[in-house]
Amino acid sequence: MVGLIETFRKNNNEKLKNDQDKEKNDREHLRQVRADRRERYTKAVEQLGDEKAPIRMGGVYTLVGLVDEWLEDESIEKYEDRLKEGQVIINNLCAYIRSPFNLASHYDELSKANPTPKGIYKGKKEKFYADKATLDSEADVRLGIIKEIHDRLQGPDKNTPGAWSDFEYDFSGSTFFYPIDFTNSYYAKPINFSGSTYTSWADFSGSTYKGWAYFNGSTYQRETNFDGSIYKGRADFSRSTYKGWAYFNGSTYKGRAVFSDSTYKGRAVFSDSTYKGWAYFNGSTYKGEAYFGGSTYKGRAVFSDSTYKGEAYFRNSTYQSKAIFNGSTYKGRTVFSNSTYTSWADFSESTYTSWAYFSGSTYKGEAYFRNSTYQSKAIFNGSTYKGRTVFIGSIFYSDVSFGENNENGSSSCFTKYTPNFYQKNYYQKTLFGSINNNFTVDNDKGHPIYLNPEGIPLKCKFLTLEQKEYLEGKFQEIEKINNKLFEVKDLKEKEELSKKLQALNEELHKWREEVTTV
């Protein structure tokens, strides 16, 4: 019996020693593995600064492989600790993308096959081809980084995370002198692309952003695509310039969406989107067509103080909170038809150069169209107004119609209140320039528009011949300046023309206030 006990004790001691030795060996192995990774990391970072592009590319692939190794290292129990190790390397890759590259400032010229007659490479063919090769090789290195990141931001199914989706990415202030493809990407953490410049096309469509997404203060020189994306946090695209077509349609914004103070030089498409938080588009300029139709705004929608130089479409939209369009200028055809406004809607202090359509819509709250100028026809046919509706202080230079809507065959209906074209308390009236108006509304279900013997709303007046001539002259001046703005390329001359245009608009605004004041 004593022998058995002694044998058992001896075996236990040997097992304990073996376990301790194994644990020690494992720790030593892990230490060596991690030391090896850090050594490879240091060498790879050094390679990123090498003059030769293939060596820089080798450093990129080493760093990418190290991130994968850290994430797959099950000897590190906590996933957060693995992420922490990987994030250090991600920060290096992002820093490389952010780093300036001098030749990128000549991208437009170096992207051509041969030197241009008027460029800085005129008469310098050898330097042109040498710089072009240098720029292209650096673009390949950076494209390699973007591709490796992009591949790991995509899950097996749509809108699912990839292996690298839990990292934070900071590309702020970058100049992307190569095409950007981040389609169908999934970001679980905040991302930052603010203050960036895209010299080629950029595609972020079909992506999901769980945290804040910063794209503000950026410039896109070619086509840009953010279609079909989901933003679960704040999305900031403010103070940006889009020189090519910009697509944001079919997207969902669950947090605040900010597109204010931006300029769109090509077509801008925001249609068929859903905004669950507040949406800001104020202070923006659209030089091409602007599409916002078929969208739903569950929070406040702010489009005030904007300029639309092309056609603007807002039809078939639903506004469940306040809709604010005041202080805007529409130079092309504008369509707000077949929309629903649950709260109050404000279109006041606006100017419509071409036809303006508000037909077939429902206004459940107050609707303000006051202090505005309608140069061409204004169509309000077949709409329902359940709250107070105010047109006072406006000028309808051409025809205005509240009659039957061609689509549903019904006239406009003011269910609770007679519309205000004259308001003694505000000392304002509305002026009309045409005799071909239609003020026929549904009197059975709502209130009439009371007319004077001249056939326009009570207490209102027709524009005098002198007033019409003044307006016609100002309209022609504005059109002339707008045409010049499209033709002129000199920035200083453009600035002077813009100042003249602003002064004319301010003069018209002041004049309208004076002539509509009782």
Regions found by a protein language model. Give the residues of each.
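Membrane-embedded hydrophobic alpha-helical segments
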Residues: M1-A35, E39
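N-terminal leader/targeting and pre-domain segments
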Residues: E28-L30, T42-E46, K52-M57, Y61-V64, ...
